[in-house]
Amino acid sequence: MTDQRLRQNGVNNVLLAYSPGMEPNSVEEYLERYPGDDMIDVIGTDIYQYDSLQYKEQLDKELAIMTTIGKQHDKPIALTETGLEGIPDSTWWTQTLLPIVSKYPLSYMLVWRNAREKVTHYYAPYPGQASADDFVEFYNSPKTLFIGDDFELYK
């Protein structure tokens, strides 16, 4: 198993996330195949938007479930994969995503890849893309923190 191999080789800078790839309706359902606190560092979920209302409702429900689990198991929670393919909604970042994720203690959030070989298969905006200006607004929100932001984590 990957975990054993990492430990055998002295690798201690990798976090393992449990993201079951399902749409749980309860804490119990989410934890059905949970391997245990000694194996997992981060509680996560992968959820993509196909329908706006359904995505918002499911994301809110899953993050609430994960927040409960994170507190019970003393684990950080993360949105390990999310996004809207092609991001055709020009306000997706601030009107769909931000209002929900800002309600929860997420340690991080990751949008899926931008595929060079597939012109419309992307999840992060690029200059001139329909949601690019909204992403800048999302980036500048006091509710978000990016790796390049100036913050004092250890002070």
Describe each PLM feature range.
Residues 75-155:
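Substrate-binding cleft of secreted/luminal carbohydrate-active enzymes
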Residues 1-2, 97:
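Short, non-transmembrane amphipathic alpha-helical segments
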Residues 25-29, 51-55, 87-90, 118-121:
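Extracytoplasmic/secreted cell-surface and envelope-processing proteins
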Residues 9-11, 34-39, 70-72, 102-104:
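Extracellular/periplasmic catalytic domains that process cell-envelope and extracellular macromolecules
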Residues 20-35, 57-69, 91-99:
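Alpha-helical scaffolding within the catalytic cores
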Residues 45-68, 75:
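Substrate-binding surface in catalytic domains of secreted glycosidases
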Residues 2-29, 74-88, 111:
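Aromatic-lined carbohydrate-recognition surfaces of secreted/lumenal glycan-active proteins
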Residues 30-56, 112-114:
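Aromatic- and acid-rich polysaccharide-binding/catalytic face
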